[in-house]
């Protein structure tokens, strides 16, 4: 029986997981510099020990409501093909081991962009663990400056 290790976190009450191998570290909320005209999901840029990292708000990216005022996100720093990126999440979970045999297709109840960014699901004893497509989550759509000209997304 083959197993995978996933680092888990929650966003809007949903449990998500990403492969442990892509997670560099998990840190408390970091002050951010906003990027003018950036897509809503691009929360800003953070300074991680002198390295500038793009922060993607998973609530916005997945189409969930905004966080309550005063509620700070946590940063899950992941390695992608574009370098390090911070995923802003509500809460950090544990590292769990899941049997590959329990992997299922994404639930039919997922709608919109969330359905496109979920690779599948694992049924745990206490919850449904949604496997996030990390690269898809950080690949933001290009900007349209209103004149019909597409502007490159800052990354």
Report residues per predicted region:
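An acidic, low-aromatic, low-complexity terminal/linker signal
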Residues: 1-155
